Amino acid sequence: MKDLTLNDLPIREELRGQSAYGAPQLDVDVRLNTNENPYPPSEALVEELARVVAEQASNLNRYPERDAVELRTELARYITKCTGVPVTYEQLWAANGSNEVLQQLLQAFGGPGRTVLGFQPSYSMHPILAQGTQTTFINCPRDKEFRIDVDAALAAITTHQPNIVFVTTPNNPTGDVTSLDTIKKILDVAPGIVIVDEAYAEFSEQPSAISLLENYPTKLVVSRTMSKAFDFAGGRLGYFVAHKAFIDAVMLVRLPYHLSQLSQAAAIVALRHSEETLATVAKLVAERKRVQQGLLELGFEIVPSESNFLFFGHFEDQHAAWQAFLDRKVLIRDVSVSGYLRATVGLPEENDAFLNAAREVAQQFL
C-alpha cells in the first residue's frame, strides 16, 4: 500500500500543518505531566465498581440510558453538597470528559462566523476546540504575572463582542485563580455566554462560580471534571452546570447515546465514594505547599497555585530544562510558555524525586 501523509488527503485547509494534542506518554520512574490524582481508587470503590460492571455487562446488547438522568442526579447532589447551591439534574449535563462538554458547547454556541475569546496562556484545548468547530479564537493575553488583566479583558470583550468567553479558574497551566468579582465584571459586559472552566476547583479555596448562576441565567456555564480530584481520569467524565435551557441547547448537537452504559455506572460508583476519594485532596494540597517551598528555596520563580500542579521557572530554554528533568527519570510538562514548566503534585516519594532533580536542574539552568 502506498505511503500517505496528511498532505495527500483532502482535509480542511486550516488543519494542514497542525499537530495533534497530547502530552508525552513515556515509561519513566516519575510521571508528573498530566495533572492526575496519583492516589489509586480505594479497595471499596474498586470492589463495588467490579460488581456493578458485572451487572451491567448482561445488558450490553442494549443502548445505554440516553440522557444519563441517574448520573446527572448524582452529580447534582454532589454539586449541591460541595457548593451549597441547590442544583437539580435538569441544570446539569455530562459527557466523556470536560473536553466533550466544551466541544458540545462550542458546537451549539460557536461555529462559522462566531468568535470565542480566551486569556492565554490557559488550557490549550480551548483554541483547538475552537478550530475544530470553526469558531474564531481571539486571545486576550494575560499580564506579566499570568493573571487576567481586568481592564484589558473588559476592553477586549467590548471591542470584539465575542459569542463565547472562556475563563479558567484555577487556570491551567499557571494554577492561579480568577476572583468572583472579576468573573462578574466579565459577565456584565459579555454579549454572549461565559464558560467558567473549573476543572481544578476541588483544590481551591475560592467559592465556585456556580454561586453566580441565579444572577446570570442566560450567560453563565460552569464546567467541571472528574478527571482530577476525583481520581477518575481513566473514566473520562466531565459535566457542566447552567440553566436548564443550556442542556436543551447541547442536546441539539450531542451524538446519540454518547455516554456508554459502563461509563455512567462507573461514574455513579465514584460519586458514591466521593468522601473517601476527595480525602486525598488535602494530602495533595499539603504536598503542593511543601514542593512549592522547596522550589522557592532552590531559587525558582513560582506562580501561586490553587491547583494540583506548580508552574515554575525562569529558564532561558525551558525545553532544555524539561529534557534535563527527563534525563533524571522525571517527566513533567513543557506547555510551550517561554521560560516556564509545569509539574503535577504527586505522591510524597514522587515529589521527593522531583525536588532532587530540580536541585540539579537549578544548578545547571538558573
Curated annotation (Swiss-Prot):
Extract one GO molecular function annotation from the record. histidinol-phosphate transaminase activity
Cofactor or coenzyme needed: pyridoxal 5'-phosphate
Keywords, in A-Z order: Amino-acid biosynthesis, Aminotransferase, Histidine biosynthesis, Pyridoxal phosphate, Transferase
Q: Which Pfam families match?
A: Aminotran_1_2
Top-level enzyme category: transferase
The protein's assembly and partners: Homodimer.
Q: Which family does it belong to?
A: Belongs to the class-II pyridoxal-phosphate-dependent aminotransferase family. Histidinol-phosphate aminotransferase subfamily.
| Protein's name according to its UniProt entry | Histidinol-phosphate aminotransferase
**Which organism does this record belong to?**
Corynebacterium diphtheriae (strain ATCC 700971 / NCTC 13129 / Biotype gravis)
- Highest lineage ranks of the organism? Bacteria, Bacillati, Actinomycetota, Actinomycetes, Mycobacteriales
